[in-house]
C-alpha cells in the first residue's frame, strides 16, 4: 500500500471504469511493509485531488483500524470511513471491527455472509462438494469448516431455517443484517 502503488491502481480503476472519481476506494489487505502513515497520506492525496470521495479498508483487525484512525486524526489526514471484513454466523471474528465502526461512525460491509456457501445448505456431511462450488475451486479460505462440529451446527441451523419457513441463506443473511 505504498504511495506509488495506490496512485497507479487508482488511476487504473478510474480508466477501466471510465469515471473521473471513485465514490469509495478500499484498501484490500493490511500491508506490514508500509507504514500506515504512508498509506493514509497517499489516500489523502487521492481525496484532495478529487479522484476519490471516501476511503475504507478491508480485512483490518480492530487494532489496525484503530491505529489508522488515530494516525489520521493526529496528522489531519483523511479517515477510513468504511470497513469490510468477513462476517457470518460461522465467521464472527470481525466483531471488534464492528464495535469500532459503531463507536467511530464508520460504515461496514460484511463479505462472505454465507460463509462461501456453507450457510446455503450446499454442503452435506459425507457428500462430495458440488462441481464448481468454492470448495472445489478455491477451498483454502473455508477448509477449516469441513468438520463434524460444523456439520452439526449446520444441521441445527438448517432445521431452524425450516421451522421458520425460510431457506438457510435467507436466515443467514437476516442474521448478518440484524447483528449490525
Report each predicted region and the residues it spans.
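Short, acidic/polar
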Residues: 2-17, 41, 65-70
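Active-site groove signature of glycoside hydrolases
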Residues: 14-35
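Beta/alpha (TIM)-barrel catalytic core signal, keyed to glycine-rich beta->alpha loops juxtaposed to Asp/Glu
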Residues: 30, 34-180
